[in-house]
Each structure stands twice: as C-alpha cells, then as structure tokens.
Amino acid sequence: MSSCTVAENNVEEVKPAWQAVYALALGVFGLIVAEFLPASLLTPMAASLHVSEGMAGQAVTATALIALVTGLVITPVTKSIDRRWVLMFFSVLQIISSLMVAFAPSLNILLLGRLLLGIAIGGFWSMSTATTLRLVPAAMVPKALAIIFSAVSIATVVAAPLGSYLGAVIGWRNVFIICALPSVVALLWQLWVLPSMRPESVGSFATLFRVLARPGMIGGMLATILIFSGHFAFFTYLRPFLETVALTSVEGVSLILLGFGVANFIGTSVAGYLLSKNLRLTLALVPFVMSLLALLMVMFGHVALLDAFLVAVWGFAFGLVPVGWSTWLATTVPDEAESAGGLLVASIQFAISAGAAGGGLIFDMSGASGVFTGSGFLLLSAMVIVFAGVKVKPVARDE
C-alpha cells in the first residue's frame, strides 16, 4: 500500500477534535494580531525608539522575510519532534516576541523579537493543513480550516483600529503586552486539548523538490502567487485610490476598510460549504470575480458608494482564498502536507512582497488605477492556470 493511501486512510479514521481546532484558532488570532499591530503603531514606536518611521517599518519586513524561510525549513528541522510540542512552541515564541517588542530598548532588540514572530508565523502556517488533516476527518477539513482562517479575518479586522486606539490610551508598549495574552490562553488550552501527533513522514529539503515535481503542484503554487500578488497590490494601494480618485475622507476610508473586513470574515465562514460543493470551480471563479472587481474600480472608481460595495465583495471573495488553497493542499498531497504547506507559505510570503513592491513601481508610473489594472491581469491569469494547470481532487463529503 502506498504512503499516500495510508495517509488518506488515517485521515478518514480520525475522530473530530474540535476543541483542538478552536485552540489553534485562538493561537492564530494572537499571531495575526501581533503581525499587524506595527502598522497602526508605527509613529509612536519610531518616536520612542528614536528612529524614522521607515526604519520602524522594517519590523513588518523582518517578520515576512523570516516567515518565508521558516516555511521552507521547519519540517526538515523538526522532523523527529511531536507536532503537539512544535505547535505549542510557536505560541511560546509569540509570547516572547510580544514581550521583547514591548520592553525593547532599541530597534535591534525590537527586530529580534519580530524575527521570533516570523518563525512562529511561518512555522505554524506550514503545518496548519497537515495538522488539520490529523484533527478531523477528511470531509470536515474545509470546515476546520474555515474556523482557523476565521480567526485570521477577525484579527485582521480588530488589530489596526484596536491597536491605534489602545496605543493612544495606554501606550504602544502596553498594547504589545496585552497582545501576548491570547497566546498565553491558547498555549494553556493547547496543552490541555492537543493530542500527541508524531511525525508521519520524514521531511527533508529533497522532499520539497519531490512534492513540487508532482503533477499540478507548480501550477497550484504559481496560481497562488498570482492571486496573492494581485490581492496585495490592490489592497496596499486601495487607500490612495479612494482618497485621490473617489475623494473619500479618512472616516470614509475607515468605513470601507471595515466593510472589507466584515465581508472577509463572512467569506471565510462560508468557504467550507462552497469548497465542498466544487473545489476547482471555486478556486477558479474567485480570482475571476476579483479581476472583474479591479476593472470596475478602474472604470467607476470615482463613485465612493460603489467603491464601498466593490471592496466589500472583494473582501468576501478573498475570504475564500486561504481556505480554498489550504483545502486544495489537503486533498492533493495528504501524505506530504507539511512539506507542501511550507511551499505554500513561501509562495504566499513571496507574493505579498512582490505584490506590494511591484505595485509600488506601477503606482509611481501610472497611479493606483494602473496598479488595479495590473492586479486584474494577474488574477485573470490565475483563473486560467487553475483550469489548465492545477490538479484538483474533489473534497470528501461528510455523510
């Protein structure tokens, strides 16, 4: 019997451990809040550390860079360690990271703390799909992933506004101390409910290349890069577009972004249902819809009310993306889900950097409308690749 068949049989026999799924979701909430906090606290952080805002902004860059590297190396490095302890270690790293940032006397110490957070983020996401496969039956994987990614949506919605508000009230250092609390609770909860999960495959760097060589994997990773690049190019320059084209006020921009966050949460919540109906169609239609939205923004972006609607629909559509591609990973390579997860994390982190950087170059040449046009092209290309070059297996049905 092949290793793939063994893995699939093991998955099907798993009894759902929903408390463990929710404990991981709480840990994810803490990780994502910590990741996005600097964006809303950049000015006071820079002033306190006596550096420029540009230098303080490297706190975000450092996290993304180390997350990319960690996603690729975490499986080989921890190949002999019980996954229960590895996952809890990521919660410990988030706690240490937040406290290091909170008490950092210099930018160097702050960046070191952010590097630890990058290890936790890259490591967790590379193992998230493989862990989910071992916590719930195959038919329930989309639902479990939707729960975990719902925590991402909630964290994304609350991190920036709550961080900005609390930073003004209690100071940015105290905000990072509070940020450690969800991970403390998550760590204790995980200690209580996470089962022992011995490594099921011997991960190595060679395994990454073997997984990538499987039919449809390169197409899937390329589609992922295009979708995330298109999204982050669009989202990074959304505010300048709203302020210059639609002449939206600061309050109006905040409301539109809130609408995005709420719709994103709803999209994530219903992702499991839609993906279980037709995985390939969902993976293909989402970037197609997003490309149409980008084009409509370019054509009718001067109407603020319409922009609010289009951005909300974009948020809903993008809510399906992380769950969708994690589900694709779980159904395509269940026997090497950790190594494949590392490739997915690296692809996403690369896409985030490329989307923001490439969008910046286009923005300087042709403004936000040019960025949105380029974003639409990337997303449309992703749809074509999903249909033509991605191997998709149907999601198991929950009888």
Regions found by a protein language model. Give the residues of each.
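Paired small-residue
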Residues: S97, N108-L116, L305-V313
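Cytoplasmic helix-loop-helix junction between adjacent transmembrane helices
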Residues: G113-A151
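Helix-to-loop junctions at the C-terminal end of transmembrane segments
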Residues: T70-D82, G267-L279, F363
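C-terminal transmembrane helical hairpin of 12-TM major facilitator-type secondary transporters
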Residues: L281-W325
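Helix-breaking motifs and short loop linkers at transmembrane-helix boundaries and internal kinks
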Residues: H50, D82, F103-I109, L247, ...
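Conserved MFS/SLC helix-loop-helix module at the cytosolic interface between two early adjacent transmembrane helices
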Residues: V69-P105
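Helix-loop-helix hairpin linking two adjacent transmembrane segments in secondary transporters
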Residues: L107-I109, A138-W192, F241
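A late C-terminal transmembrane helix in Major Facilitator Superfamily
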Residues: T332-A368, G374-S375
